UniProtKB/Swiss-Prot annotation:
Pfam assignment, any one: Epimerase
Source lineage: Bacteria, Bacillati, Bacillota, Bacilli, Bacillales
Classification via SUPFAM superfamilies: NAD(P)-binding Rossmann-fold domains
InterPro entries: DUF1731, Epimerase_deHydtase, NAD(P)-bd_dom_sf, SDR39U1
Protein name in the entry: Epimerase family protein SSP1921
NCBIfam families: yfcH
Domain of life, source organism: Bacteria
Annotated source species: Staphylococcus saprophyticus subsp. saprophyticus (strain ATCC 15305 / DSM 20229 / NCIMB 8711 / NCTC 7292 / S-41)
Disulfide bonds: none
Length: 298
């Protein structure tokens, strides 16, 4: 019976992941920042903001590191530090935990983001592309992945998932994107030509477990649907599924003034495809945006 250790296990992605894992013959320990009790016999919580939390962790086979402050807040100077440190410090704490243990994890799955890649209207990015940090978000991703790769020195297989925009009803981008359409105000953002590399949350959870269970899977994987859309087409598809018009336009300048540096998530984007996932014979349930939105939008 495998024992999973999950950070970020109470968040949008982590909650769905826990539901999927617990259907198999597995135990789960979830690291949290507050005291929690479990009603499930195979799920336990450890508050790792308390002293000596390490003593409560049993032998672990698989580590899934999803910890990190949300990007969906205004990026003030202090909050940017929170975004960075919440990821770096959590990953370092995990490494130090297992560095001092005889029983090492077989696999580490570490979350990351497509913000690693430079914004480009014309380039299609695969996992083969390598670059150095060029803005705040890419610096966060670069440092986070660097910390995760330390686990390779323990003999642990490391899988890094660069997540695209995760579509879910329970949080993330979709509820915020749908809100203007609910009020008949949806439309083009900026040029509308920027790419939205997205993935349905069910496919993300399935792909994550697929890479964990595929022994040949290691290194970086792009967690995006194979069919990427421009923002204008994304919005048009969302409008059709929502039975609302797609007719307004918000200039780039207005978005940058309203969101500050966080506007890069909306305007400065990349076309990212999941070559390595598909090479491992992973089959998407929602490869097409319309199918994904029809499942999520009610």
């Amino acid at each position: 019976m495998k024992h999973y250790l999950i950070t970020g296990g109470t968040g949008m992605i982590g909650s769905q992941l826990v539901k999927a894992i617990i259907q198999s013959d597995a135990h789960i320990t979830i690291l949290t920042r507050q005291d929690m009790t479990s009603s499930h016999p195979k799920i336990s919580y450890v508050n790792w903001s308390q002293p000596n939390w390490e003593n409560e962790i049993p032998d672990i086979d698989i580590v899934i590191n999803l910890a990190g402050a949300s990007l969906n807040k205004r990026w003030t100077k202090s909050y940017k530090q929170t975004i960075m440190l919440s990821r770096i410090q959590a990953t370092q704490a995990l490494f130090e935990l297992f560095q001092n243990r005889k029983h090492k994890p077989e696999v580490l799955f570490n979350a990351s983001a497509v913000g690693y890649y430079k914004p480009d209207l014309y380039r299609t990015y695969t996992e083969l592309y390598k670059t150095l940090p060029f803005d705040f978000l890419s610096e966060v991703v670069y440092q986070w992945e660097r910390m995760a790769r330390q686990f390779e020195t323990l003999g642990t297989r490391v899988v890094i998932g660069r997540f695209g925009m995760v579509l879910s009803n329970d949080g993330g981008a979709l509820p915020m994107m749908k809100l203007p359409y609910d009020f008949y105000l949806g439309g083009k953002l900026g040029s509308g030509r920027q790419w939205y590399s997205w993935i349905h949350i069910d496919d993300l959870v399935r792909a994550l477990l697929h890479t964990i269970n595929t022994e040949s899977a290691r290194g970086v994987f792009n967690f995006t649907a194979p069919i990427v859309e421009h923002q204008n087409m994304f919005g048009y598809t969302l409008a059709r599924v929502s039975h609302r018009p797609h007719h307004t336009w918000v200039p780039s300048l207005a978005i940058r003034l309203a969101l500050g540096q966080m506007s890069t998530v909306v305007l400065d984007t990349q076309k990212v495809i999941p070559n390595k996932l598909q090479a491992t014979h992973f089959k998407f349930k929602y490869p097409d945006l319309k199918i994904a939105l029809e499942d999520l939008v009610h």
